Amino acid sequence: MDSTACLKSLLLSISQYKAVKSEANATQLLRHLEVVSGQKLTRLFTSHQILPSECLSCLVELLEDPNISASLILSIISLLSQLAIDNETRDCLQNIYNLNSVLSGVVCRSSACHNDSVFLQCIQLLQRLTYNAKFFHSGAHIDDLITFLIGHVQSSEDELTMPCLGLLANLCRHNLSVQTQIKTLSNVKSFYRTLISFLAHSSLTVVVFALSILSSLTLNEEVGEKLFHARNIHQTFQLIFNILINGDGTLTRKYSVDLLMDLLKNPKIADYLTRYEHFSSCLSQVLGLLNAKDPDSSSKVLELLLAFCAVTQLRHVLSQMMFEQSPSGNILGSRPKSLEPTAALLRWLSQPLDGAENCSVLALELFKEIFEDVIDTGNCSSTDHFVTLLLPTILDQLQFKEQNLDETLVRNKCERMVKAIEVLLTLCGDDSLKMHVVKILTTLKCTTLIEQQFTYGKIDLGFGTKVADSELCKLAADVILKTLTLMNKLKQLVPGMEVSFYKILQDPRLITPLAFALTSDNREQVQSGLGILLEASPLPDFPAFVLGESIAANNVYRQQETEHLPRKMTFQPLNHGFSTSAKCLTPPPSKDNAPALNIEDLIEKLQAGVMVKDQISDIRISDIMDVYEMKLSTLASKESRLQDLLEAKALALAQADRLIAQYRCQRTQAETEARTLAGMLREVERKNEELSVLLKSQQLESERAQNDIEHLFQHSKKLESVAAEHEILTKSYMELVQRNEATEKKNTDLQTTCESLNKHIETMKKLNEALKQQNEKTIAQLIEKEEQRKEVQSQLADRECKLSNLHKIAKSQEEKLNVLQKEKEDKQETIDILRKELSRTEQIRKELSIKASSLEMHKAQLEGRLEEKESLLKLQQEELNKHSHMIAMIHSLSGGKISPETVNLSI
């Protein structure tokens, strides 16, 4: 069974199931879905024909039905997942059929029914649809979906946690409305804590999902500043590179690359990465991932390397690592490990058209960035050997070796050509690298390339051609202009290049791409077109008038397209891959809907013209015939396109009828809901009146309570004043207590002083008694000496012997007298001190006057005694003087050796 028959059978079975939802019809529909899924009709669904579009519309409508079985939902989702692998079909499902909102409703219904299999398949399909795509938050069920996903992530972990995290990461990325909704939730802090706890998960996929959500929600907030602070950012870099290099698969690697690219858009984090000490080793491991055979994984790695090139310092590190100096004589197969990335890039660059088209384009962009850095740093000599290997591969990309390619493959080929020519233009920025290009690029290759673009790009002579209608025509024009720019730079170095360059500039077919460039919204294309126009305008055969007409026609077409934009049935395409799909379903301007001439009339005129032309021997007749044949084929293609658009209009009309019926049903439901709401409003008004009465009573009670509060407030003021007075009295009482304590302390000090004085007085008494005893002894000795002096005359011999002893005794007595004199002086000083202390004590303590008076009396007695002692001492001094005279007289009588003046017996 061919593909068209399969789709017709599927459409018929869907109609039967919608009419009668029986088990037999459901089984038949499941069987047809399995047949379509088994035939892998992805290319057919991307062709934008009526039958596949109707099938997709019916399948989406079935998903909206809440009464279909789970097995049928799973089968439909399986088919849609298979179709969503193609980027163009994925965008169509999102933007035209609004599959995101439909699947969100299915998720909410399946979660309520606890159907995990349907829930898992829907989440996985939503994750595939929303990955790296614009997401409209205004769709139905989207808010419920986000709330449900957050709640499920915060619940206990199961097999659905990982896809829920992945879908949340897609929804939050570059979507401010979703981020705002999540940030306004009441449990957002607990959600952040849950995500942070997932950073320690054993699965690297869960870790990168959680980190991606955190970066989308908190990167420019306080939580993000703490999470991505300079203290933590190096650990975050290490974690991301670890996930990127050792990830669980292509999915994990994709999300880790997207996360790192989003972080690099922050200038502060990009600066942190330039100072990351392990960046070189991590970059080396990332370059090693290019050796993998998975094109999806390699394309994400190439995107990451291009993101590194957006930061000048990182691009410099990358170029140094790509072109490290290798030992001389090495060929590509025997190069050291440091040059393996260049070999991997060459391998991805030379992939076939039906292979990894993204990898080839990204590899060429990476070469352009690297060579720009090499030229800026002046390190072109290190790339000479690699450039000789790269240029043949690039020139292979500039040739159409395959024949009978479809439009998609031709478009991919043109994209590669554009990037390859940009690499050659970059190499021409340095003289030494330009010479490598001159050696391998010939004039024939450039002219052949331009002629091929005139052919494959369907660029004719007519001005006003709708270049914006055809993506292929855009790419062909870009290839032609960039090739001419390259020829302009090399025209003085390549033989024959200058002649061919100016010849092509005078070709009328150049008008269409030149007009497209001058009316483009791309700055580089406008600059390139102006450069070519500057070279072509002085030429004599340059069709300047035709160029002006073409530019005017393009401007008119753009204006009409802008005016018809609100009437278009489809959404605007969101990325490059979906542009042609939207344009195929979009009607052209009104002036092209009705061609001026019918095709049969043109054929008759052409045949008549041929009969006449057979008789005319003009050389230009064949050229005119080619022009008319090209016009004829163009009109035929336009007629077929109008027929397709008519069928699309009919289909759109049927869909509009269905939408009108749905609107009528929704209107009746809305009226019913309005009546219900009116009844509810009346009930609310009645309750409001009851509440108003209750409110008045509450107000009276509140007024009474307010009066009571005022009385209590006045009473509290009085209590506060009493409390203040009490506090003042308490302070004064404490001050008096402190003064009393100080006085008591002084009293105790004075008592101790008095006791010490009493002790001193007792010691003085003892000393006086001792002095009395000594005086008595001295008197006895003097008496004895007086008796001895009476016996001197009879005992002169004995006296001479005893004279020495007496002399010694006199000396000892003299010493004792000195000691007594000193003690007397000490006593005098002590008496002075005591006088001072007594006077001070008398002033301080008047209450102790009785004791002070007794002390004064005692003092007077002591002074009397001291005076008596002094008188006694004077008497003793006089007696000693008498004794000294007597001793002197004795000596004078004995020998006359000692004069009375020399004898001193004074104390």
From Swiss-Prot:
This is Protein CIP2A. Pfam families: CIP2A_N (PF21044). The modification Phosphoserine is found at S906. It comes from the Eukaryota. Acts as an inhibitor of protein phosphatase PP2A. Promotes anchorage-independent cell growth and tumor formation by preventing dephosphorylation of MYC, thereby stabilizing MYC in human malignancies. Together with TOPBP1, plays an essential role in the response to genome instability generated by the presence of acentric chromosome fragments derived from shattered chromosomes within micronuclei. Residues 639-887 form a coiled coil. It comes from Mus musculus (Mouse). Homodimer. Interacts with MYC. Interacts with PPP2R5C; this interaction stabilizes CIP2A. Interacts with PPP2R1A; this interaction stabilizes CIP2A. Interacts with TOPBP1; forming the CIP2A-TOPBP1 complex. Highly expressed in 17.5 and 18.5 dpc liver but not expressed in adult liver. Expressed at moderate level in embryonic brain, muscle and epidermal layers. One of its GO terms (molecular function) is protein homodimerization activity. One of its GO terms (biological process) is DNA damage response. Its main location: cytoplasm. It is found in: Cytoplasm; Chromosome. Belongs to the CIP2A family. Residues 389-559 are annotated as: Required for homodimerization. One of its GO terms (cellular component) is cytoplasm. Signal peptide: none annotated. The modification N-acetylmethionine is found at M1. The lineage of its organism: Eukaryota, Metazoa, Chordata, Craniata, Vertebrata. Residues 161-247 are annotated as: Required for interaction with PPP2R5C. Disruption phenotype: Mice develop normally and do not display any abnormality with the exception of a mild spermatogenesis defect. A motif (Nuclear export signal) lies at residues 600-614. Gene3D superfamilies: Leucine-rich Repeat Variant (1.25.10.10).
